[in-house]
Amino acid sequence: VSTAPYGAWQSPID
């Protein structure tokens, strides 16, 4: 979870 706390499921970096 770099920039996306809940979007980590999609892209852990993005």
From Swiss-Prot:
Thermal dependence of activity, per record: Optimum temperature is 45 degrees Celsius.
pH curve summary: Optimum pH is 8.0.
GO molecular function terms noted in the UniProt entry: aminopeptidase activity
Keywords: Aminopeptidase, Hydrolase, Protease
Signal sequence annotation: none
First-level EC class: hydrolase
GO BP: proteolysis
EC numbers on record: 3.-.-.-
Subunit structure: Monomer.
Function of the molecule: Inactivates puromycin by catalyzing the hydrolysis of the amide linkage between its aminonucleoside and O-methyl-L-tyrosine moieties. May have aminopeptidase activity.
Protein name: Puromycin-hydrolyzing enzyme
